[in-house]
């Protein structure tokens, strides 16, 4: 069957109405297959689903299925198929939408009612179909069955005809007389609505008197039945009160056991919580050990890196020493060049002196020619002015050279001081780093990075200073070349001056001044050479100091490496101790864990014993219920037997009593050989023994109802029969007030109060032992049962059977038999 078109139409109208009033508004749909895509988020929000965005139809219908399964409509979800609905099956989609509307009717009835009323007033939704569907759901709830709950969605015959087109049925040729329904006889049978078992003929034959007598007889039977039922009701009420009292005691004991179980559960939870805490502590200890090992590995790595960095620093120091050697070699070369320059200056000075002597001789020779050369003085003065300007330029250049040499000296001093400061700073930083590494190994990586950066910067600075020194040396060499060029130029100029002096006597004074200037320049050069010698000496001293510093630094490094090795050995020893401590901690923790496991196992065994005790109590309750049913039977039988013994004469009881323990039967057979006072005196000498039926504790019927004969208990019909009563001391102690008592004359005809032990005490045990020493019990299990020790050897029936049997005690009839003899 397919889905009803009216149902599909009304569902489409309603969902489009919901979509038009929903914020944000959704698009209208023309088929239910588009429901999940356009109205899925709206339906999910109306049903308060967690997921409200759907990429596929499978996800949408799966979410709606889970949501419906958590509501009160979960019993209808067995017939839903999310996969078929996702594939576009109209029946499955209608099922989902119908349950969605039912969910809205249950949880959001006000909103659904307002929407349906407004939609019906606007003629936008056919609400009749939906109301019929809701009525069908109500019928499903009343029938308490969910089979075919979607039957209201299927297409009926009228819908099929409407879908196939209406048409008039063809007229048949049957006559109306041939279609008459057959009827029964005019008179209905009397048994049609009667419940009597007698035949209707017997009812018709009976006379009114017979009917009256039958009704009277039935009335008497019903009265007798009512009377018996009332008596049974009274007995049952008494039994009910007894059982309710026992039930209350059992409930109290059950509540006590539950409280004990709750306490034990709390103890078990505390033990479990303690075990979890210990496991967490173990995990923390493991993490600490792991962290310590990781730190040890990191410290080893940092030590190796530090050793590598120290080796690299040694290599760099060796490079610096090599560079210093090259610098000293360059300084030696410069010293050699300075010596050569000084020798050259001495040679030139000697040559100038020789020239001066020659000039003096020529001066003397030319003094006579001074007058002649006065005219040429003006030209010589001009030449002199030019020479003065040149001398001034030369002096300026010499001053510049001196300033440059001073600057070079200062730069060299600064560079050396910087190198020394950098070496001292480097040593200080190395010492600080060593101390910091020994104090805190965790900061080694950052310090190493800082040292590397600083070392790289220092290398750059050293390279820059070396390059600057090399540039200064190159500049000094260039200046030397320039000075040599200047010296050559001076030589050339001196030669020109000599030529000019030779040419004219007026130029003698100018040449003298030039010589004086040259002398000054030579003196300045000598001073510069001396300063350079001092600089070289200072550099040599600095080199010696640097060598001494390097030696000291090497010694300090050796000492530091030795200290570092000692501290490393100490750290290794401490690490070994820590590892031993961790091993001991692990062993202690394992022992603690095993101890707690044992405690937990003991607690679990204790809880299991409590659970077993509860189960045993439940079994005892079931046994008590069964005993209750047996008690009802026995109470009825006992009531009948008591009535018989109360109403029947002694003769009848004598006929019925077949037990050898029956006292009336014995006296009737043998005659009263002794008087009543003697009998009472004899009975008073014996201890009182209570004999009563243990109806509460025995499940078997010990007697036979009236009118029946038992094959198992022949000859045991007497109420005083010993086999009728159990001889257990606990059962004797649990007898009620209706128990019969054979006692002394003072207590004859009275019921003995039952003994209800409040528990095994020291006094009770003493009383029992004293009694059993005087009169030993018939069964060995009686003492153990009364004391409550089920582990006693006398409580085992097999031990009782295997043990030596005792002689039976003399009964009350032994006295009569002895007197008779």
UniProtKB/Swiss-Prot annotation:
Residues 211-634 form a coiled coil. One of its GO terms (cellular component) is cell cortex. It is found in: Cytoplasm, Cell cortex; Cytoplasm, Cytoskeleton, Spindle; Chromosome, Centromere, Kinetochore; Cytoplasm, Cytoskeleton, Microtubule organizing center, Centrosome. Residues 162-180 have a biased composition (Polar residues). The keyword Cell cycle applies. One of its GO terms (molecular function) is dynein complex binding. Residues 181-199 have a biased composition (Low complexity). Residues 161-199, 736-758, 779-821 are annotated as: Disordered. Keywords: Cell cycle, Cell division, Centromere, Chromosome, Coiled coil, Cytoplasm, Cytoskeleton, Kinetochore, Mitosis. Its main location: cytoplasm. One of its GO terms (biological process) is nervous system development. Interacts with gpr-1; gpr-1 forms a complex with gpr-2 and GDP-bound goa-1. Essential component of the spindle apparatus required for spindle positioning and chromosome movement. Acts to recruit or anchor gpr-1/gpr-2 complex to the spindle and cortex. Also involved, directly or indirectly, in cytokinesis and in the coupling of DNA replication, centrosome duplication and mitotic division. This is Spindle apparatus protein lin-5. The lineage of its organism: Eukaryota, Metazoa, Ecdysozoa, Nematoda, Chromadorea.
């Amino acid at each position: 069957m397919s889905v009803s078109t009216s149902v599909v139409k009304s569902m489409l109208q309603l969902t489009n109405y919901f979509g038009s009033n929903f914020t944000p508004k959704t698009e209208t749909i023309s088929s239910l297959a588009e429901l999940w895509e356009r109205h899925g988020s709206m339906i999910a929000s109306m049903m308060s689903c967690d997921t409200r965005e759907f990429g596929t139809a499978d996800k949408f219908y799966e979410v709606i299925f889970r949501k419906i399964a958590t509501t009160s409509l979960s019993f209808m979800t067995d017939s839903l198929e999310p996969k078929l609905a996702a594939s576009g099956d109209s029946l499955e989609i209608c099922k989902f939408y119908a349950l969605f509307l039912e969910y809205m009717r249950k949880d959001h009835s006000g909103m659904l009612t307002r929407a349906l009323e407004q939609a019906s007033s606007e003629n936008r939704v056919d609400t009749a179909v939906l109301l019929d569907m809701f009525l069908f759901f109500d019928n499903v709830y009343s029938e308490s069955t969910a089979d075919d709950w979607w039957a209201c969605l299927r297409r009926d015959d009228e819908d099929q005809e409407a879908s196939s087109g209406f048409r008039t049925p063809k007229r048949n040729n049957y006559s109306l007389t041939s279609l008459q329904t057959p009827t029964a006889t005019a008179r209905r049978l009397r048994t049609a609505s009667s419940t009597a078992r007698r035949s209707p003929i017997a009812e018709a034959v009976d006379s009114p008197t017979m009917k009256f007598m039958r009704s009277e007889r039935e009335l008497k039977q019903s009265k007798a039945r009512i009377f018996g039922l009332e008596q049974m009701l009274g007995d049952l009420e008494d039994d009910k009160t007894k059982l309710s009292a026992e039930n209350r005691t059992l409930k109290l004991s059950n509540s006590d056991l539950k409280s004990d179980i709750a306490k034990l559960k709390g103890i078990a939870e505390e033990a479990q919580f303690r075990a979890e805490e210990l496991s967490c502590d173990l995990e923390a200890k493991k993490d600490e050990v792991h962290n310590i090992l990781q730190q040890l590995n990191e410290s080893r790595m940092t030590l190796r890196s530090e050793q590598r960095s120290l080796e690299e620093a040694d290599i760099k120091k060796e490079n610096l020493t090599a560079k210093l050697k090259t610098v000293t070699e360059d300084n030696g070369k410069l010293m050699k060049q300075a010596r050569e320059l000084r020798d050259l200056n001495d040679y030139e000075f000697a040559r100038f002196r020789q020239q001066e002597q020659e000039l003096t001789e020529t001066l003397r020779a030319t003094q006579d020619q001074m007058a002649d050369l006065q005219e040429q003085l003006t030209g010589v003065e001009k030449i002199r002015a030019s020479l003065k300007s040149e001398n001034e330029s030369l002096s300026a250049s010499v001053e510049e050279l001196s300033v440059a040499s001073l600057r070079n000296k200062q730069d060299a001093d600064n560079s050396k001081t910087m190198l020394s400061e950098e070496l001292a700073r480097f040593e200080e930083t190395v010492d600080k780093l060593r101390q910091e590494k020994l104090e805190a190994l965790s900061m080694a990586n950052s310090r190493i990075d800082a040292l590397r950066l600083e070392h790289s910067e220092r290398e750059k600075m050293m390279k820059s200073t070396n390059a600057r020194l090399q540039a200064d040396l190159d500049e000094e060499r260039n200046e030397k070349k320039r000075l040599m060029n200047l010296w050559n130029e001076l030589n050339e100029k001196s030669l020109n001056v000599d030529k000019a002096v030779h040419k004219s006597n007026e130029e003698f004074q100018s040449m003298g001044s030039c010589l004086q200037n040259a002398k000054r320049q030579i003196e300045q050069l000598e001073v510069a050479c001396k300063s350079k010698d001092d600089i070289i000496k200072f550099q040599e001293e600095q080199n010696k100091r640097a060598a001494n510093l390097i030696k000291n630094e090497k010694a300090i490094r050796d000492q530091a490496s030795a200290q570092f090795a000692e501290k490393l050995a100490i750290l290794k020893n401490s690490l070994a101790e820590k590892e031993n401590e961790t091993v001991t901690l692990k062993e202690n923790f394992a022992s603690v864990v095993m101890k707690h496991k044992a405690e937990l196992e003991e607690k679990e065994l204790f809880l299991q014993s409590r659970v077993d005790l509860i189960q045993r109590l439940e079994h005892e309750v079931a046994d008590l219920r069964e005993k209750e049913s047996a008690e009802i039977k026995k109470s009825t039988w006992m009531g009948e037997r008591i009535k018989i013994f109360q109403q029947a004469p002694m003769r009848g009881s004598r006929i019925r009593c077949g037990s050898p323990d029956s006292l009336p039967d014995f006296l009737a057979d043998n005659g009263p050989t002794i008087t009543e006072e003697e009998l009472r005196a004899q009975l008073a000498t014996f201890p009182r023994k209570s004999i009563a039926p243990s109806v509460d504790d025995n499940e078997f019927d010990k007697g036979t109802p009236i009118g029946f004969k038992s094959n198992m208990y022949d000859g045991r019909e007497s109420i005083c029969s010993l086999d009728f009563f159990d001889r257990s001391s606990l059962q004797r102690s649990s007898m009620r007030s209706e128990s019969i008592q054979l006692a002394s004359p003072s207590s004859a005809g009275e019921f003995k109060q039952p003994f209800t032990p409040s528990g095994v005490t020291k006094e009770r045990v003493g009383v029992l032992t004293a009694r059993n020493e005087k009169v030993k019990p018939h069964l060995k299990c009686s003492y153990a049962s009364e004391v409550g020790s089920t582990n006693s050897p006398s409580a085992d029936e097999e031990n009782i059977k295997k043990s030596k049997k005792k002689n039976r005690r003399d009964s009350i009839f032994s006295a009569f038999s002895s007197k008779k003899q």
